[in-house]
């Protein structure tokens, strides 16, 4: 059995297959998944699993160079934003880029996968751009 926090087979496979610059999106329950992009659906019910827990567990195995947020999160979601600020300051999320929510949905077309959570707070979405460990 694995020693790291991430136990989900599909997520472990995804992270192991990433190359530098590949995009992984973690989305709330309402984020549309573009046709042709792999969906890894973790949602069980409202709030389970939540956005931040999913992100923290994914970061236990994924090297992130930078991340993208919809600028709407800055005004509409102070609690998740505070946690993201801490992760950014700690170096876990790399550099930040902001764009409007509609552009974020366009960016998600380039993702290797969209991970759907049970999060029901709007704009709790993040695009993670894979980095390298060397």
UniProtKB/Swiss-Prot annotation:
It is an enzyme of class 5 (isomerase). Its EC number is 5.4.99.62. InterPro entries: D-ribose_pyranase, RbsD-like_sf, RbsD_FucU. GO terms for cellular component: cytosol. The keyword Chaperone does not apply. It catalyses: beta-D-ribopyranose = beta-D-ribofuranose. Pathway: Carbohydrate metabolism; D-ribose degradation; D-ribose 5-phosphate from beta-D-ribopyranose: step 1/2. It is found in: Cytoplasm. The active site is at residue 20. SUPFAM superfamilies: RbsD-like. Catalyzes the interconversion of beta-pyran and beta-furan forms of D-ribose. Belongs to the RbsD / FucU family. RbsD subfamily. This is D-ribose pyranase. The lineage of its organism: Bacteria, Pseudomonadati, Pseudomonadota, Gammaproteobacteria, Pseudomonadales.
């Amino acid at each position: 059995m694995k020693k790291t926090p991430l136990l989900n087979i599909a997520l472990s496979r995804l992270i192991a297959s990433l190359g530098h610059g590949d995009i992984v999106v973690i989305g709330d329950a309402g984020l549309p998944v573009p046709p042709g992009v792999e969906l890894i659906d973790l949602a069980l019910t409202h709030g389970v699993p939540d956005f931040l827990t999913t992100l923290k567990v994914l970061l236990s195995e994924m090297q992130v160079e930078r991340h993208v947020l919809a600028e709407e999160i800055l005004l509409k979601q102070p609690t998740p934003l505070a946690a993201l600020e801490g992760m950014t300051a700690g170096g876990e999320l790399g550099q930040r880029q902001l764009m409007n929510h509609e552009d974020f949905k366009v960016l998600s077309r380039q993702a290797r996968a969209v991970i759907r959570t049970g999060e029901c707070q709007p704009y709790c979405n993040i695009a993670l751009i894979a980095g390298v460990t060397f």
